[in-house]
Amino acid sequence: MICSLASNLKDLTQFPKAEIEALWCPWRVEYFEQETPNPDFLSEAARSSDDAAHLVVTRRKNAFLMMNRYPYSVGHLMAVPYRKTGDASSLGENEVLELWNLAVHGQRLLRETMKAQGFNVGLNLGQCAGAGVPDHLHLHIVPRWNGDTNFMPVLAGTRMLSEGLRGLYDKLIATQERIEKNNAP
């Protein structure tokens, strides 16, 4: 079908283009209004003691779990090593283990808080692979739901975010406190 459609076109500029409509995402306006985006926000979050300001959900010895401040999918978390590196092979065994344990913990938080039914978990290593912060790797934990690719993104090219960052942050912290209380000796 595409081959026959393309053969009927005089040039590729006539090929139909998919357009994506924008929905207002108030938390993203900060990102676009920055004179220069802060490329070191992960290191700042690692050093800071103000977890709420940096949306840090939990801290461990070698890594921490934080919300993505500019998500396109509600609930998007990131497991981040304290040590700044863009090379996964330079991570120590304890760092790798802790990153993975934080990814598992993040999945539990999202399952219990948002009723997530599945997850995309992964790394973008290097700028050409889509890393927004290529020199400080981070493991993405993106919640998914059956039917989350509904008519809006398919037909209208639009994604909807159902909850603001601060409200979700508070819910994740409450869920984490409940989990810790239930697991206390």
Per-segment meaning from a language model:
Residues 76, 130-150:
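Histidine-centered divalent-metal-coordination microenvironment in nucleic-acid enzymes
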Residues 114-127:
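A short glycine-rich, hydrophobically flanked beta-strand micro-motif that places a catalytic Asp/Glu
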Residues 8-35, 144-185:
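C-terminal helix-cap and adjacent tail motif
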Residues 1-74, 79-80:
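Active-site microenvironments that recognize anionic phosphate/pyrophosphate groups
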Residues 92-116, 166, 171-173:
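Long, well-ordered alpha-helical scaffolding segments within enzyme catalytic domains
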Residues 78-100, 156-161:
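Short histidine-centered catalytic/ligand-binding loop motif
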Residues 70-74, 82-85, 144-148:
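Short connector loops/turns at beta-strand edges and beta->alpha or beta->beta junctions
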